[in-house]
Amino acid sequence: MRPLLRGPAGNDDEESSDSTPLLPSARQIEAAPACCSARYNLALLAFCGFFVLYALRVNLSVALVDMVDSNSTLTDNRTSKECAEHSAPVKVHHNHTGKKYQWDAETQGWILGSFFYGYIVTQIPGGYMASRIGGKLLLGLGILGTAVFTLFTPLAADLGVVALIVLRALEGLGEGVTFPAMHAMWSSWAPPLERSKLLTISYAGAQLGTVISLPLSGIICYYMNWTYVFYLFGLVGIVWFILWMWIVSDTPETHKTISHYEKEYIVSSLKNQLSSQKVVPWVSILKSLPLWAIVVAHFSYNWTFYTLLTLLPTYMKEILRFNVQENGFLSALPYFGCWLCMIVCGQAADYLRVKWNFSTISVRRIFSLIGMVGPAVFLVAAGFIGCDYSLAVAFLTISTTLGGFASSGFSINHLDIAPSYAGILLGITNTFATIPGMIGPIIAKSLTPDNTIKEWQTVFCIAAAINVFGAIFFTLFAKGEVQNWALSDHHGHGN
C-alpha cells in the first residue's frame, strides 16, 4: 500500500503542524511510484553530480603528493615516535614523468586552503540566484566551471603558485553555488514525506565521490602521472553537465517526460508550502531562531567534518604511522561508512514519518542528535585509545559513519521551515559552515606543535565539544513546520 498524503488535523500545536504533509483534507492522493519516476531520476543524476563535485574538490590533496619534489620540500619530518612502526615498505612509484615543484609546507597549505576562500563567497548569492533563475542552470554551470578550471590545473601549476591558488579559488566559486542550487530545486521536486530519501540520495554522491576519488587519484598517479588526475575528472564533469542539461528540469511543470499523475502528486503535496512572494523577506529570515538553530548545528558538524577531512591522513601517517598506500585506503574507509549511513537514514527517516507518524521535528532532532553526539563520543575515544591501531581506525570510522545520520536531520531542515527559500537558507548556513574548513585545521595544527597523542586528544575533544553544543542548540530551538514569514499572505491566513 502506497502512503496517502494526509490533510492537517486542524489544531495548531507544534507536533501537529510538524507532521507534514500539508494537503487539504478533502483531497487525498496516493504517492506516485518511485521506480523510473522523474523525481528519483533527478536524485540519481544529482548523486552523480555531487560525486563528480567532490572528486574535483579532493583530487588535489592526493595529486599534490606527486607534484611536490619531496627531496626539496622545506619541511621537517613530524612523524611521532610514540607509536611503533608497523607498516610494510612502500612500493616505489612506476611513473615519474609528471613535473615536480619545490613547494614548502606553508605553500602547500595555501594551495589546499585557497578553495574555501572562493567557496564561501558564492553561498548566499548562489541561493538567491537559484530562487530567481532556477537551480538547474546554476548547478550545472557550477560543476561545469569547476570541471573546466580543473582541466587547466597543470597549466596553472606551471605558471606558478599564485596562478594555482587563484585557479583553486575560482573552482571554489563554482562549487559554492551547487548545494544552494540543489536545495532550491528540491523545494519544487521533493514531496514532504519523501524529502529525507530524495535529498540523502542526491547528497550521498559527495561521500562516495570522496571514497572513490582518493584511492583512484593515487592509482592514476602511480600508473600514469598526476596531470591525468585533473584531465580525467575534468572530462567526466563535462560529460555529466551535458546529461544534466538534457534530462533535468527546474520544476515538475516544465519536465517533458514526467507522468501526469506524478506531476499532480508532487505539485499537490507542495501547494500549501510554497510562497508566491516576489521579494525575499531578508529581515524575517535573519531574525528566525529556527534558521540560527540550523546555522549552529551546521557550523558545529562541519568543524569535526573538515578537521577529519583535512587532517585524518596526517593523523594516520604521523601518529598511527600507516604508510602512504595504507593511508589512502584507511582515510577513505570512514567516508564509505558515512555514504552507506546516509542512504539508510534517508529511508529510515521517511519510514518513521509515514508508518509511525513521527512528527517532522522529532525526526530531525533524533537524527541530528545521533549524527552529532555519536561522532563526538567515538572521536574522543579514538584519541584516548592510543596506539591500538585497529581500535583507533574502527572508532574513527564509526565516528564518521554516524555523522551520516545528520543528513536526515538539520541538513535538510531548511526545506521544512521555508521550502520557497531553501536555497537562500542553505547559502546562509553553509557560509557559516565553511568557516571551520578555513580555520579548523589551522587551529588543530597550532595545538599539535610536538605532534603527540596528548595534543591530538585536545584537538579531538574540542571538536567533540563543539559537536555536542551544536546538537543541543538545534534540539532546543529547531522547528519542523513552515514558518509564517516563508508563506504568502494567502497561505499565511489559511485560505
Curated annotation (Swiss-Prot):
Result, substituting residue 39 to C: Markedly decreases H(+)-coupled sialic acid transporter activity
Topology, Lumenal side: 66-109, 158-162, 221-225, 313-331, 386-390, 445-455
Residues annotated as glycosylated: 71, 77, 95
Ranges per topology, Cytoplasmic: 1-41, 131-136, 187-197, 248-290, 355-365, 413-423, 479-495
Molecular functions per Gene Ontology: D-glucuronate transmembrane transporter activity; sialic acid transmembrane transporter activity; symporter activity
Ranges where the record places region Disordered: 1-22
Positions of transmembrane segments: 42-65, 110-130, 137-157, 163-186, 198-220, 226-247, 291-312, 332-354, 366-385, 391-412, 424-444, 456-478
Membrane topology: Multi-pass membrane protein
Motif (Dileucine internalization motif): 22-23
Protein role: Multifunctional anion transporter that operates via two distinct transport mechanisms, namely proton-coupled anion cotransport and membrane potential-dependent anion transport. Electroneutral proton-coupled acidic monosaccharide symporter, with a sugar to proton stoichiometry of 1:1. Exports glucuronic acid and free sialic acid derived from sialoglycoconjugate degradation out of lysosomes, driven by outwardly directed lysosomal pH gradient.
Protein name: Sialin
Organism of derivation: Rattus norvegicus
Gene from which the chain derives: Slc17a5
